């Protein structure tokens, strides 16, 4: 039932491992691209949200954030939150090793951070209409996120990446316009529900940092948010989606671990 999709995810995990080993610069550039693409989506939805009544703001922001994951998937790039699912399935299928997975994930996260901050810098240098006023939506939301309780961030992060990985999973299983519909619905649910995405937050925090933010908005608060949200994102991507669909597949239908060693996947 899910064998073909798992095979595609495992093959992508092997591709990610090869790219990381054989072309580290290319891997980091591709990771930075993913952070930038998500950042472009964040700038769009906060530009719109800043103009809207709070009663309709979550719906409109959610309905327009699909551009972020559409760019990541269709243009192609390396997104940390998607990698949590891909690499877990790659390990279970024997396409990569545990060591490769845990070496790649932090590199992807850092590459995403580079791209996220770069886009925020460009926006700031370009005038950044959202940034000069400390009551702007960018600043109020960023401050609220950095002062939220750890467990709230963790579980909102888990719910968020469950939806993001579902969007990616369904995009793999569908063709044509159905891919875009799957992405759109899942990201609408994620944004409108107020969940937490580590890479999306990177751009939001950078935007606020480069603007006229409240004094209570601090680097320690940013670190607090990104730590717990990243852990929550990893839980749902690796466990709910990766292990979930692996064990939802009958044992006889699961891909058999490849005979090659992990080192061979990087050739």
Please identify what each model-predicted range represents.
Residues 1-267:
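Alpha-helical transmembrane segments and their helix-helix packing motifs
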């Amino acid at each position: 039932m899910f064998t073909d999709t798992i095979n595609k995810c495992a093959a992508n995990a092997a591709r990610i491992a090869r790219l990381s080993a054989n072309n580290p610069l290319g891997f980091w550039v591709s990771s930075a691209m993913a952070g930038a693409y998500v950042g472009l989506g964040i700038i769009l939805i906060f530009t719109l949200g800043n103009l809207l009544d709070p009663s309709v703001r979550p719906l409109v922001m959610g309905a327009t954030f699909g551009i972020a994951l559409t760019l990541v998937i269709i243009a192609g790039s390396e997104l940390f939150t998607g990698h949590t699912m891909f690499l877990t399935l790659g390990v279970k299928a024997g396409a990569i090793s545990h060591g490769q997975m845990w070496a790649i994930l932090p590199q992807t996260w850092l590459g995403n951070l580079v791209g996220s901050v770069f886009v925020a810098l460009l926006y700031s240098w370009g005038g950044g209409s959202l940034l000069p006023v400390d009551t702007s939506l960018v600043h109020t939301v960023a401050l609220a996120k950095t002062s939220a309780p750890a467990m709230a961030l963790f579980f909102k992060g888990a719910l968020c990446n469950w939806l993001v990985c579902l969007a990616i999973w369904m995009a793999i299983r569908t063709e044509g316009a159905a891919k875009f519909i799957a992405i759109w619905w899942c990201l609408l649910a994620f944004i409108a529900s107020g969940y937490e995405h580590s890479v999306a937050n990177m751009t939001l925090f950078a935007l606020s940092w480069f603007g006229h933010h409240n004094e209570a908005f601090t680097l320690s608060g940013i670190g607090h948010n990104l730590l717990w949200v990243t852990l929550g994102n990893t839980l749902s991507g690796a466990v709910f989606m990766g292990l979930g669909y692996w064990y939802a597949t009958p044992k006889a239908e699961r891909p058999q671990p490849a005979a090659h060693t992990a080192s061979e996947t990087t050739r």
